[in-house]
Amino acid sequence: MVMQFQELENPVQISPCHSHTSSGFDMEVMSMKPAKGVLTEQVAGPLGQNLEVEPYSQYNNVQFPQVQPQISSSSYYSNVGFYPQQPEEWYSPGIYELRRMPAETLYQGETEVVEIPITKKARLGASAGRIKGDELCVVCGDRASGYHYNALTCEGCKGFFRRSITKNAVYKCKNGGNCVMDMYMRRKCQECRLRKCKEMGMLAECLLTEIQCKSKRLRKNVKQHADQAIHEDSEGRDLRQVTSTTKSCREKTELTPDQQNLLHYIMDSYSKQRMPQEITNKFLKEEFSAEENFIILTEMATSHVQVLVEFTKKLPGFQTLDHEDQIALLKGSAVEAMFLRSAEIFSKKLPAGHTDLLEERIRKSGISDEYITPMFSFYKSVAELKMTQEEYALLTAIVILSPDRQYIKDREAVEKLQEPLLDVLQKLCKIHQPENPQHFACLLGRLTELRTFNHHHADMLMSWRVNDHKFTPLLCEIWDVQ
């Protein structure tokens, strides 16, 4: 939940056709057969006859730390009755497991020191020197290479988790989900391995989206170009020639007629969808109890969702998408679009001196500082970019039309709608800020921060659920609150 406060004379009501519960969705997750594991390391001696019982029998003279058996937990969702029943492998950008177990080491005792000096051969693919000491992977017990997706893991578990999430893989355990994960069993049971990854704190939202990867490449390219320009300047380039070249590039960078029409259409829809100013004024002018503050914030969020639905319906090409894809895009982007709109209001719409007052009132609404601090940090980082309303509108549309949302059936169709928006945004950045070639990459980089807020929002929902806070039917629908 986040704070929405913007001027709108007439908030719009959501169309009945968009009241669609998550239980009505056709969850189409590709079923993938587990690949047969192959031992990557060559061993000196023959393996034992029974690999299931003695997987390390070739190492008779070496002592290994004992693995603490991990008890498979039942579905967390079914225990709290918070979200609909889904497989544990299922992830959605707006819905995450709400419990993250601490990355505790699975090993009891200390490894015995061998007096004979032994030179260890580095694992292939491991990043030597990234961590101190012989830290162990919290998933399988192999040598860890660093913190990957929020957990200390080896390169193998890092790659396995990334592939499993990006491909929406669904695995099946032959032992009823009771496998004890170690370096041998990780090759035999992918379901238990993926579950162990999640139990140890690995987060799906830490994976970069296609847009975020593009942002990283842009930052790298910009740095290379900047270094090259400095080198050329040091060799005697005339400063006036550089200024002339910059001016020439700015003149050549302009929107095509089709891009101008697209931008006008987006801006017309974005500017019409505003939230009632009286809610914000009420929140700032009067001081309420924590419960009353929560009710006001709920009203703001409801108004935001109504505005978001209307804006989304008017995005060019959105109505041509499959109906289930439309709902998946709307639900998947609701939290991110909400935070982005709030950042615009925080940086541009609030009167001078009201930002600190707003933060103070929100902290008194019962929301933990654990969520409020990164939220306002994000608002301030966005304000530093000095974004125009055109950039806010385009970035919001890009967030909504993200082809990597869960349960999108026709990702190519969504990507075709998103690409023209990215092109227009990139050109606008060159036109408005030619002296700052990194501006476009910085805008896309904010999408990385937005993805992390999905998890914060899920945690907030859980804490409010425990405290028996009530939500409007619209928020229950869009956030899948039962």
Swiss-Prot record:
<feature type="zinc finger region" description="NR C4-type">
    <location>
        <begin position="137"/>
        <end position="157"/>
    </location>
</feature>
<keyword id="KW-0863">Zinc-finger</keyword>
<keyword id="KW-0862">Zinc</keyword>
<feature type="binding site">
    <location>
        <position position="371"/>
    </location>
    <ligand>
        <name>chenodeoxycholate</name>
    </ligand>
</feature>
<feature type="compositionally biased region" description="Basic and acidic residues">
    <location>
        <begin position="229"/>
        <end position="240"/>
    </location>
</feature>
<feature type="modified residue" description="Phosphoserine; by PKC/PRKCA">
    <location>
        <position position="145"/>
    </location>
</feature>
<dbReference type="InterPro" id="IPR001723">
    <property type="entry name" value="Nuclear_hrmn_rcpt"/>
</dbReference>
<keyword id="KW-0395">Inflammatory response</keyword>
<keyword id="KW-0805">Transcription regulation</keyword>
<comment type="subunit">
    <text>Heterodimer with RXRA; the heterodimerization enhances the binding affinity for LXXLL motifs from coactivators. Binds DNA predominantly as a heterodimer with RXRA. After activation by agonist binding interacts with coactivators. Interacts with NCOA1, NCOA2, PPARGC1A, CARM1, SETD7, PRMT1, GPS2, SMARCA4 and MED1, EP300 and SMARCD1. Interacts with XRCC5 and XRCC6; decreasing NR1H4/FXR transactivation activity towards ABCB11/BSEP. Interacts with PAGR1 AND NCOA6; indicative for an association with an MLL2/MLL3 complex (ASCOM).</text>
</comment>
<dbReference type="InterPro" id="IPR001628">
    <property type="entry name" value="Znf_hrmn_rcpt"/>
</dbReference>
<keyword id="KW-0675">Receptor</keyword>
<keyword id="KW-0391">Immunity</keyword>
<comment type="similarity">
    <text>Belongs to the nuclear hormone receptor family. NR1 subfamily.</text>
</comment>
<keyword id="KW-0832">Ubl conjugation</keyword>
<dbReference type="Pfam" id="PF00104">
    <property type="entry name" value="Hormone_recep"/>
</dbReference>
<keyword id="KW-0597">Phosphoprotein</keyword>
<feature type="binding site">
    <location>
        <position position="379"/>
    </location>
    <ligand>
        <name>chenodeoxycholate</name>
    </ligand>
</feature>
<feature type="region of interest" description="Disordered">
    <location>
        <begin position="229"/>
        <end position="253"/>
    </location>
</feature>
<feature type="modified residue" description="Phosphothreonine; by PKC/PRKCZ">
    <location>
        <position position="452"/>
    </location>
</feature>
<dbReference type="InterPro" id="IPR001728">
    <property type="entry name" value="ThyrH_rcpt"/>
</dbReference>
<feature type="DNA-binding region" description="Nuclear receptor">
    <location>
        <begin position="134"/>
        <end position="209"/>
    </location>
</feature>
<feature type="zinc finger region" description="NR C4-type">
    <location>
        <begin position="173"/>
        <end position="197"/>
    </location>
</feature>
<dbReference type="GO" id="GO:0090575">
    <property type="term" value="C:RNA polymerase II transcription regulator complex"/>
</dbReference>
<keyword id="KW-0007">Acetylation</keyword>
<keyword id="KW-0010">Activator</keyword>
<dbReference type="GO" id="GO:0030522">
    <property type="term" value="P:intracellular receptor signaling pathway"/>
</dbReference>
<dbReference type="GO" id="GO:0005634">
    <property type="term" value="C:nucleus"/>
</dbReference>
<keyword id="KW-0804">Transcription</keyword>
<dbReference type="GO" id="GO:0004879">
    <property type="term" value="F:nuclear receptor activity"/>
</dbReference>
<protein>
    <recommendedName>
        <fullName>Bile acid receptor</fullName>
    </recommendedName>
</protein>
<keyword id="KW-0399">Innate immunity</keyword>
<dbReference type="GO" id="GO:0050728">
    <property type="term" value="P:negative regulation of inflammatory response"/>
</dbReference>
<dbReference type="InterPro" id="IPR000536">
    <property type="entry name" value="Nucl_hrmn_rcpt_lig-bd"/>
</dbReference>
<dbReference type="Pfam" id="PF00105">
    <property type="entry name" value="zf-C4"/>
</dbReference>
<keyword id="KW-0238">DNA-binding</keyword>
<dbReference type="InterPro" id="IPR050234">
    <property type="entry name" value="Nuclear_hormone_rcpt_NR1"/>
</dbReference>
<feature type="binding site">
    <location>
        <position position="457"/>
    </location>
    <ligand>
        <name>chenodeoxycholate</name>
    </ligand>
</feature>
<dbReference type="GO" id="GO:0045087">
    <property type="term" value="P:innate immune response"/>
</dbReference>
<feature type="modified residue" description="N6-acetyllysine; by EP300">
    <location>
        <position position="167"/>
    </location>
</feature>
<feature type="binding site">
    <location>
        <position position="341"/>
    </location>
    <ligand>
        <name>chenodeoxycholate</name>
    </ligand>
</feature>
<dbReference type="GO" id="GO:0030154">
    <property type="term" value="P:cell differentiation"/>
</dbReference>
